[in-house]
Amino acid sequence: MSKSPVAIIILDGFGKRAETVGNAVAQANKPNFDRYWANFPHGELKAAGLDVGLPEGQMGNSEVGHTNIGAGRIVYQSLTRIDKAIEEGEFQENKALNNAFTHTKENNSDLHLFGLLSDGGVHSHINHLVALLETAKDKGVKNVYIHAFLDGRDVAPQSSLEYLETLEKAISDLNYGAIATVSGRFYAMDRDKRWERVEKAYKAIVSAEGEKFEDPIELVKASYANDKNDEFVVPAIITKDGKPVATVKDNDAVIFFNFRPDRAIQLSNAFTDKEWDHFDRGANHPKNIKFVTMTLYNPSIDAEVAFEPIEMKNVIGEVLSNEGLSQLRIAETEKYPHVTFFMNGGRNEEFPGENRILINSPKVETYDLKPEMSAYEVTDALVEDIKNDKHDAIILNFANPDMVGHSGMLEPTIKAIEAVDENLGRVVDLILEKGGSAIIFADHGNSETMSTPEGKPHTAHTTVPVPVIVTKKGVTLREGGRLADVAPTMLDLLGVKKPAEMTGESLIQK
């Protein structure tokens, strides 16, 4: 039976910007995109900041974008979720955090706060540490000690002095808390099983092994004098009257305030793993500690979790599956996890009726050397699929504008967009021939801004809106759309009722 498929087509990193200088999207020859823009309802979508569950003004990215697209609702990212919880008072009542506070009161013991000391917002945020100090004081926790991991990667390489000063000001304003140890993230936040690094951080925290300093600021300055920037500061101990300020002991509580899991797992395991064999934890290994992690680092870690993952019900894949509709996810390697795992709300398995095609990305050093990447091969496979009437719904990603855009090179990025346009035409014209329709848009900006105002290469994502085209005659698109509105639009085109969990709205005006 002939199918009239509805497709979501993501031109990854294809933003909308009026200025044409350094704008690969504007400078590319793209007759197909321009033809659809001229002949079909079109507009723009917001794809950054609060509109995708990130802090205001923060650029979007592919993971966040595809999660929002698939969910059909704004999905708050960990940083924003925690910020919101602090603002609205939920943080102060958080069960896991309060369990840590209670543990110290019942055991007449100390609370220790571990985490990356910066406002980089990638692994942690210093504001969350300050909120923990304020909350612990309000809840009557007697002693709190901070084990500060210095950044220098997500922020400037020598910026820790300002963060230490911010922390010391908070401690002084509250007249509460003290810094106990300081360590570069290279040691405390290793993720590559370099256990000798983790061991140094662990032994500083538990056994006060390492160089001793009266003042964290002096410690960092000594490290700089030794050519070691923030990231590489060797774990060291802060002393008062010649004695270590604090170590983690039996019956204490720990809150690890990093929200990104990958670099917090190993140190957490060093404290909680009963079957430990990576290094000798020594006689001081603390027993009966209450260990709390800000988010779920790994289900195998014996810890309470302050902000559990949000389980997403009725993402686009599940809704299509429940309706008995067949669906295809197709992309090349670079964006395959995005059209599958992220689009499915962090789920690896296919839904019933969901099929997947993975086309290998070319094996080149950098994609500016092959700007077309695998766009032709992806399209060949998809055209074959559409001709054979295989699927009711299609989710396709063209990786080129983003992956080549990251090179910061204008000419290859223009070529990348031209290759995508040629293949976009092959796909969309065939869908239209079959009586179907497509939603053509991007997940975030990048290739529309290839140079800085000073004329230097620009390699990052942007906060600009993205274009959207719905290839259906006789409808009008409303303004004010965002990525969360794409899945409801697809359901609208398929004649499927939107589930209550999808708070996004169809872009098609009723």
UniProtKB/Swiss-Prot annotation:
E.C. designation(s): 5.4.2.12
UniProt cofactor note: Binds 2 manganese ions per subunit.
Annotated Mn(2+) 2 binding sites: D12, S62, D443, H444
Biological processes annotated in GO: glucose catabolic process; glycolytic process
Keywords, ordered alphabetically: Glycolysis, Isomerase, Manganese, Metal-binding
Pathway noted in the entry: Carbohydrate degradation; glycolysis; pyruvate from D-glyceraldehyde 3-phosphate: step 3/5
Residues at which Mn(2+) 1 binds: D402, H406, H461
Entry binding sites for substrate: H123, R153, D154, R185, R191, R260, P261, D262, R263, K335
Pfam families hit by this protein: iPGM_N, Metalloenzyme
Similarity remark: Belongs to the BPG-independent phosphoglycerate mutase family.
Assembly, per entry: Monomer.
Protein name as it appears in the record: 2,3-bisphosphoglycerate-independent phosphoglycerate mutase
Organism: Listeria innocua serovar 6a (strain ATCC BAA-680 / CLIP 11262)
